[in-house]
Structures are given as C-alpha cells and as structure tokens.
Amino acid sequence: MVAQIHYHKNSKLSIRRNKKGSGFLYINKNGKPVSGARSSRISKLVIPPGWHDVLVSADPKNYIQAVGMDAKGRKQYIYHPLWVKKNQERKFDQMVDFGERLPTLREAVKANMRDRTLTRDRIVATIVWLLEHTFIRVGNKTYAKDNQSYGLTTMREKHVDIKGNKVTFSFEGKSGVFHELGVSHPKIAQTIRECMDIPGYELFTYFDEDKNKRVVDSSDVNEYLKTHTGMDFSAKDFRTWGGSVLAGDSLYKKGNATTETDLKKNITDVVAIVSTHLGNTKKVCRTYYIHPTIIKSYEENILVPHYARSYSRKSSGGISLTSEEYATWSLIKDS
C-alpha cells in the first residue's frame, strides 16, 4: 500500500557505492559492507554502472531509493516503484478535473497577458501559455544548477531569439535533449522582449512595487494554477493533457484496426507522434503522458465511434474546450 512509503529525502541516503575490481561494494554508515536482504534489494535497483557519487537509501520503503551523478554530471534519481505507480495514477485521475477547469484558466491567462505593465501575473500567464502551446517543461532551479539543463522558468536570455512576433527557444532540456522550437504571438514576444530589457541572465524577471528585482520560478506557476483553478495542478499536467489529447485524436484519424498487426502498428505510430511533440522517449510517453483509457478504448474499438459522435455534436456540453479536447475529456470521464 502507498501508506507504506516513507518520505525521507536525504537523511536515509546513507549507503554509498565504492568501486571494487570490476564491480561495486556498498558501504553502510558504519563503514561496513551491506549484505543479505539489503544487498539483494540494492541489486534489484539496477543502478547504472556509469553513475558516480551514488547514495542508496537504507530504508527499503523510502520514496527515493538511490541518487547519483551520470556521465554528464547530471543528478539522477531512482524512486520506489509503489511511489511511482501511485504518483502516476493520481496524475491521470485528475485529468477530468483539469479539463473542466482549463477554460477558466485560459481566460485568466488571456486577461493577464494584456496587462500594460510587466507584472508577475503577466509573466506567469505568459509561461502558462507557453506550457500549453510548446510542451516545454516548467523547469526548476535545483535541476538547472545540478544538470545545466533548462525549462521555462530557468531559461536564460541566451536561450531566446526574437524576430518580430516570433520567439525561438534553443536550449538543453531534461536528460540532455536539445530543443529548438518557436512560437509566433505578438503579446508573448512583447512580454519576453520587456523581460530581456531587465539586466541579468535570467529570462523571466520583473520589478516589484518596491523596485526590487524578482525572478519567476516554478512555485509562482503552481501558485497561479491553484489560484485560477482551485486545485493543486502542476505544470506537468499540461504535458499529460496535451499528450492524451494528441494521442486520442491521432488514433481516431487512424480508424479502427482490422487486424492485430494493424492495431499494434497504429498504437506504435501514435505513441511516436506524441513522443516527437513532447520530446520524450516512446516508452516514457506511453507510460506517463498518455492516459491509459486512450489506448485501452482504442484496443476495444470504443475510441473511434466515441470521437465520431463527439465531433458531430454542435455542443461541447457547456465546457469551452476544442472538439479534440472535449472528445478526449468525455472519453476519460465516462471510462
């Protein structure tokens, strides 16, 4: 059960890995090699041999089981499988609520993007718009510092180029993946241009009422989301929502498969489409960013007729979503 999971971030990471011959030796906090069940548990974690500065949790139920630095100097984590499973289920479970509240959030974003002065809300609204339209991760300071990889809130001025209304982002994201993508929007371009007029390397900055320079971070984004939705959504929910909507519509366009071979091929093709848009591997996309109802309903020949009925309707049930979004939302809601 999830109640068994413990939440010690660093205090329980007391086992270190030392090189020994062609293998490794794990040493506890008393300087003695681990053995027995603890040694067996560590082996099952399959910690990459290329990691260095590896620390392992002494608690088999800790949500973080191991940390280490990869070959590029990026901090990596191995989490308890029960924690991963529950965290993912919770994220998928809130997709219906996310869809219901998305129109209200969009109205707030639209209004704040029209602010005449460079306020915190105007910048956060700009970031939220970019989250939805580019699928760029929100980023966090710790990850940027440890791994030299970036997201929207940790972006630097050197990562951005503006020509007229077009903004191009070029940066290294999570797992060392290089991203280059652009958007064309006058208000987005203007806000970023004004941010870049403020001295400093951080991109999303502003001056508060006391003329103090402030840097917008991921906590500002999550606070904004809660203010305008009333729920604890995070920037990651945009990627799950976007990946699920794209997968559902793409499978609908494939039509019902007539053979098992076609079924597998269609699903594989669509997962690849989502993978390209999100910048993740196919395995990660299918596991974490496509709601399981999408794949399951396609396999059961439910998805295509559902989308066909939904697209033929004149109304979206009083919810201001696009036709693709409403079809996806209602499929998940009714599952």
Kindly give the residue locations of the regions a language model identified.
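A positively charged, amphipathic N-terminal helix/segment that binds anionic biomolecules
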Residues: 1-150, 154-267, 271-278, 285-287, ...
